């Protein structure tokens, strides 16, 4: 039934995504992280103390985000339908494909309507960089980078952990990833507090990021890309990012679409140089945002198909 639960959760995300009316667990995880930071900063003042606080936050969030779903499912383990209903709902809340598509395509529609100011504003909701003065090409690049990176973080990774350990594992991953997105910055405020959150997130994304890269490469035909070229670009440029993981999905996407990603961006008023990823075979055009969304969905579908075939073949032994 684990396979059925995952398929239903994926279909739910396809259909309705993250409705605003639903009490999303990530909201409460985020509130807990903010509370731990606020209280912790009152007691941990030194750089070493802040690093220790970061480690304590990691433990608290990992235990809480795993423990609560585990206890909920354990309490209803004798009720078949309630158990699987809750497992499906919890897994569904960890998946972000539909919301990523919606947010990414808001930028696309603004560019299609030649409203660059609107595109900058919509982009600012989903990226950490300063979007106020971005050109159209820079907006497109940022949107594609976000979709490719979050194909790994927001789609493939939670699926991977759900396949290993159901909703508790998927939710624990989501807690760790949320913690990294809130604390894992290398600026003056978070360089010490965010050290362990960032490192732990890197560890948890190590395998999913590489799986994502492979799946994106294999999905190349869906956008008339070349599988072999995609793998070559991904493997060549896999280290062209400060993160040990991000260049895999971004490199795969760049290889599939024949574009160049990376380069200098402005974060919190500071210019941050990043090596380029991919080859500029094509100029960046807003229609490529649609291609990146197609690659995200194709990768997710391929992941589920491979898992289904694996489970089925194992059960037939």
Curated annotation (Swiss-Prot):
Keywords: Cell membrane, Cobalamin biosynthesis, Membrane, Transmembrane, Transmembrane helix
Subcellular location: Cell membrane
GO terms, molecular function: ABC-type vitamin B12 transporter activity; threonine-phosphate decarboxylase activity
Coiled-coil features, chain-numbered ranges: none
One of the Pfam families matching this protein, by short name: CobD_Cbib
Function description: Converts cobyric acid to cobinamide by the addition of aminopropanol on the F carboxylic group.
Protein name per the record: Cobalamin biosynthesis protein CobD
Native species: Clostridium tetani (strain Massachusetts / E88)
Organism classification: Bacteria, Bacillati, Bacillota, Clostridia, Eubacteriales
